């Protein structure tokens, strides 16, 4: 992993990535580091430490802070640790999330609903709250919240996820308007199908995989690195006038 490129320059900048242990978060953490940023991974998954080790062993700079985004004090600690270690906060990719066990709404256990909302919505709210407080102190920053095309359309069987992701988009738009004049840009990302550990069971089943590929205009799923590239673009100066928007990366799925 060569940590050099001229496409983006995030040298001396600091980024938080929640859910950075695996999948899209891992790819984004590595890409940030490759382009010069110092990266803090916040995750409950101890694999986050391995991602930071990979970055550090290849000339980058990263740290892992075990974080449950449902817990205000842990999120507050994540931001405080980053500021204490690296001196500030420029970018945040709020990516931590879970998928519910598929079930029709009337059969859904309340505890399952609460769990998805707590991680996928409240977690984003808490991260934004403490990230924005720090960015206000330092004169600005960029936040990207990972939503989903499920935040724009719906799929049966995952009502809590659909509800949470719709709300993340609304939260992103509202906050973008509140802080635009304080030089904080906030956007939502809406990936389509991405091949990650979270979706691995779909791709391991030939019949499910076949149906998914048949339903994809490009005939394939995205790789995590393709989503990570959009995150870095939105954080870069190339997107300096973009705020309060939803950026869809779904291989054309919602164009139909």
Language-model-detected regions and their locations in the chain:
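Substrate-binding pocket helix/loop in short-chain dehydrogenase/reductase
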Residues: 103-105, 109-117, 212
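Active-site helix of classical SDR
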Residues: 128, 164, 172
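Short C-terminal tail/terminal secondary-structure segment
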Residues: 2-7, 99-102, 153, 232, ...
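C-terminal substrate-recognition "lid" of short-chain dehydrogenase/reductases
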Residues: 128, 140, 220-249, 253-254
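Canonical Rossmann dinucleotide-binding motif of NAD(H)/NADP(H)-dependent dehydrogenases/reductases
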Residues: 8-40
